[in-house]
Amino acid sequence: MAEECLARKFNLSDNYCPAYFDGLLCWDPTPWNTLAVQKCFKELYGIQYDDTQNASRLCLDGVWHNYTNYTNCTERIANGSPTDVASLIYLAGYSLSLAVLSLAVFVFLYFKDLRCLRNTIHTNLMSTYILSACSWILNLVLQNWSDESQQDQTSCMILVICMNYFYLTNFFWMLVEGLYLYMLVVETFTAENIKLKVYTTIGWGAPAVFITIWVISRCFVNVLPSTGPDGLAMFPEAKMCIWMHEHQVDWIHKAPALVGLALNLFFLIRIMWVLITKLRSANTLETEQYRKATKALLVLIPLLGITNLLVLCGPSDDSWFAYAFDYTRALMLSTQGFTVALFYCFMNTEVRHAIRYHVERWKTGRTIGGGRRRGASYSKDWSPRSRTESIRLTV
């Protein structure tokens, strides 16, 4: 584009500033002592700008002034816009999920009865939801309550890196959940061969590798120019956090997340096939078989992250359907952690029994004043883990 701009040579006298490209817009030859004005750009790095406003550059005695005035080229976000409404939905959903997930993680960590490989995987997945929600809320706060012109690039870089890492760990722990269930239900003879260390390496280690590669690549790309060809500031928003602007190298961490979702979709199909086959072989009514299969499907969808596939692509126009899709996506994605905590902790029979047992033991201790404890059906550290029960409690 710069070459095309500079090639604009008309039959002009010497009393003109030559064609000039400042890195964003092309300025045609302009008479001396004239303020050149043209429309702002519509979009820059995925961000929509108000193109009804103007940018300007001054031509003085045959030489362009060393600064282009882009002050009026502001981001197009109207008050009460669908983007604002969707952000509020995200904020409410993430806040709710954060509170419920924190309580669920506390339950799994506090009660030793619940400690097993399956619940440890659940705890790690819920932890990634918590970290992702915290980073999203922090990012929202910084974007709306901080002065963008004074944003510290180092702090912003750390926040964006952490946010992308937590998001990616979330997808990889979903993959771990899918792999664990697949090995448990489909590959029943090899399920015990995969230890917690392997799952931990997949869930926390693999995302670290992709994020490291992404950070190194991102450091070498020019995302948002802060100076023009003359070396002087040309765009006020160049002081914004450049790490928040999308770039093609972002696919380094986006692609693994999509691959993980695709694998989980495969795991879900195989698991449902095995479950439906077992239900058909059992002596149960057909309606009962459909009910159990539907229940298993609805419970597994949020655990394996299939919700993300349902709202992966949508309309981008200004129709009512596009607005409804944005709101639905915001609601489903922000409350996904809440759904996982609800299904796999608070509605889990094993968890409810463990909580009830400890509450009763606490009441008994207070009643007898620290005397002899009532006999219990199982101790605090005891937890039955047969394969059949594990499948039942998981699905």
Curated annotation (Swiss-Prot):
Gene3D superfamilies: GPCR, family 2, extracellular hormone receptor domain, Rhodopsin 7-helix transmembrane proteins. Residues 1-87, 141-155, 218-248, 315-329 are extracellular. Residues 112-119, 177-195, 273-295, 350-395 are cytoplasmic. GO terms for biological process: adenylate cyclase-modulating G protein-coupled receptor signaling pathway; cell surface receptor signaling pathway. The chain crosses the membrane at residues 88-111, 120-140, 156-176, 196-217, 249-272, 296-314, 330-349. It is a multi-pass membrane protein. Residues 369-395 are annotated as: Disordered. GO terms for cellular component: plasma membrane. This is Diuretic hormone receptor. Belongs to the G-protein coupled receptor 2 family. GO terms for molecular function: diuretic hormone receptor activity; G protein-coupled peptide receptor activity; peptide hormone binding. It comes from Manduca sexta (Tobacco hawkmoth). Expressed in Malpighian tubules. Glycans are attached at N11, N54, N66, N69, N72, N144.
